[in-house]
């Protein structure tokens, strides 16, 4: 590096800071040189081509950093393909089978150091070739897979998850202060690039209602006040049309959404069944009849288990069990403390509903998209306010976030349970450790033949020794969502 260049780099820096800056530049330069050498090697190029061909042939859906990078215009891409080996994350509705199949393909192509292993997250399998992580294959139910595929973008023959799904994954991560916050800066940078190039919706939202209207308007005001009070008293977190209307106060008058007294509530509750039961009891106290509670199962891992409260044909409440620890802010209204989900939390949930393939979401797709766009606009217009409901990256959260230690303990307990039960299929699903080379080289004992004077020759076959694929520890798996 020339002296003149050193002076420019070190302008306004102390001697020690300048020395460290020069060191970092040297490290970056050396890393780039080694990266180019690795990426351009024939073996690595072959490895990349094989996994890309596999994804194309099976029409699997890529997600994560590689997906975001691939759908951005070249000037906004953050990966340098000349120095970085792409790590493909993709969805499959038959992930275990696909992981083993991909490992077999590499082995047949002449690679001997090949293995497919379970990740830390159940349902995710990692494929390694020559000790390089080349693929993370994550299971999702076929219904979600098909919903994603419908809106996926194809680039050079590879399917990439829809922008709104990729956006949802990043909002989800930014809404979990008890998660891996060391990733937040990287995630936000990528989210800004995605938002710059892809809008949430092009639907005309001027005539879209943000609250569910009730078909039966009789006792509408009583129902609204009763449900609202019951939910506030339970300390749940609001995130539906009720919460959306509260955020509208931060928009210009002509863009504000009026909060109508429709019983239209969506909340997070640590015990959604109890929340629904209490709401039903309070409604009965007010003489309301024809109330029923419907349990709705989780949709993969994008929409949690929830309970719907209906009065006749009208849905007045959806209470969801948290799938992590979701950030919220506190609003004091009429002397009451209301917990309102942050915009990041609300967007992560709304955008997930788009791919749940449930009738009660599908009939309100435009509403969900427009509510999401409205919240996005609120956030953009008030990005640096950091007060009241607008405080972003709140460190208070609702729900439980599993730690790495808890996940490891769960897997250890599961391994013990499955070993005792002898359920080999489920054991493999949880603890896959598949090495094609070991299967090929498993020794077989000689087959001996015994003769008896009075009997015909009879063969006795000794079965092949089965290798236990679960002896090794699993490599730590990175987060599947992003």
Protein language model features and the residues they cover:
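N-terminal regions immediately upstream of nucleotidyltransferase
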Residues: 1-46, 154-222, 441-458, 462-470, ...
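Residue-level detection of beta-strand-connecting loop/turn positions
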Residues: 9-12, 131, 313-315, 335
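Active-site nucleotide-donor binding segment shared across nucleotidyl transfer reactions
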Residues: 44-96, 222-273
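Short, conserved charged micro-motifs
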Residues: 96-103, 273-280
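Conserved catalytic core of two-metal-ion nucleotidyltransferases
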Residues: 104-146, 282-328
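Active-site and adjacent loop segments of nucleotide-processing enzymes
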Residues: 135-214, 315-450
């Amino acid at each position: 590096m020339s002296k003149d260049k050193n002076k420019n780099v070190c302008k306004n820096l102390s001697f020690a800071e300048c020395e460290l800056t020069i060191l970092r530049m040297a490290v970056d330069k050396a890393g780039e040189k080694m990266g180019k050498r690795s990426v351009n090697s024939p073996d690595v190029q072959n490895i990349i081509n094989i996994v890309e061909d596999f994804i194309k042939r099976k029409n699997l859906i890529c997600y994560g950093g590689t997906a975001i990078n691939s759908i951005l215009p070249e000037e906004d891409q953050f990966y340098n393909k000349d120095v970085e080996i792409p790590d493909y994350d993709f969805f499959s509705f038959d992930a275990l089978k696909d992981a083993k199949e991909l490992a077999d393909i590499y082995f047949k192509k002449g690679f001997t150091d090949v293995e497919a292993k379970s990740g830390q997250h159940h349902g995710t399998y990692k494929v390694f070739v020559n000790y390089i992580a080349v693929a993370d294959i994550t299971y999702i139910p076929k219904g979600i897979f098909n919903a994603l595929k419908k809106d996926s973008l194809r680039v050079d023959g590879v399917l990439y998850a829809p922008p709104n799904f990729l956006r949802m994954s990043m909002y989800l991560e930014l809404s979990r202060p008890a998660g891996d916050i060391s990733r937040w800066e990287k995630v936000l940078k990528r989210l800004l690039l995605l938002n710059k190039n892809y809008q949430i919706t092009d639907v005309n939202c001027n005539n879209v209602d943000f609250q569910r209207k009730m078909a039966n308007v009789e006792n509408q005001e009583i129902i609204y006040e009763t449900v609202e009070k019951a939910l506030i008293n339970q300390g749940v977190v609001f995130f539906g049309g009720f919460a959306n209307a509260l955020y509208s106060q931060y928009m210009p008058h002509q863009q504000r959404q009026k909060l109508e007294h429709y019983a239209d509530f969506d909340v997070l509750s640590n015990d959604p069944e109890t929340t629904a039961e209490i709401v039903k009891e309070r409604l009965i106290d007010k003489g309301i009849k024809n109330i029923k509670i419907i349990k709705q199962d989780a949709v993969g891992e994008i929409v949690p288990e929830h309970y719907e409260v209906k009065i006749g044909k009208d849905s007045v409440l959806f209470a969801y069990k948290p799938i992590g620890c979701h950030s919220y802010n506190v609003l004091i209204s009429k002397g009451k403390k209301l917990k309102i989900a942050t915009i990041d939390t609300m967007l992560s949930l709304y955008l997930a509903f788009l791919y749940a393939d449930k009738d009660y979401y599908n009939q309100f797709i435009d509403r969900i998209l427009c509510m999401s766009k409205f919240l996005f606009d609120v956030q953009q217009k008030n990005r640096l306010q950091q007060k009241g409901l607008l405080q972003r990256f709140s460190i208070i959260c609702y729900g439980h976030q599993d730690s790495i230690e808890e996940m490891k303990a769960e897997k250890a307990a599961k391994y013990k349970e499955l070993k005792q039960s002898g359920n080999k299929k489920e054991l493999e699903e949880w603890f896959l450790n598949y090495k094609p080379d070991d299967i090929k080289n498993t020794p077989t004992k000689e087959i001996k033949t015994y003769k008896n004077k009075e009997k015909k020759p009879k063969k006795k076959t000794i079965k092949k020794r089965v290798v236990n694929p679960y002896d090794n520890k699993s490599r730590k798996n990175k987060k599947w969502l992003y």
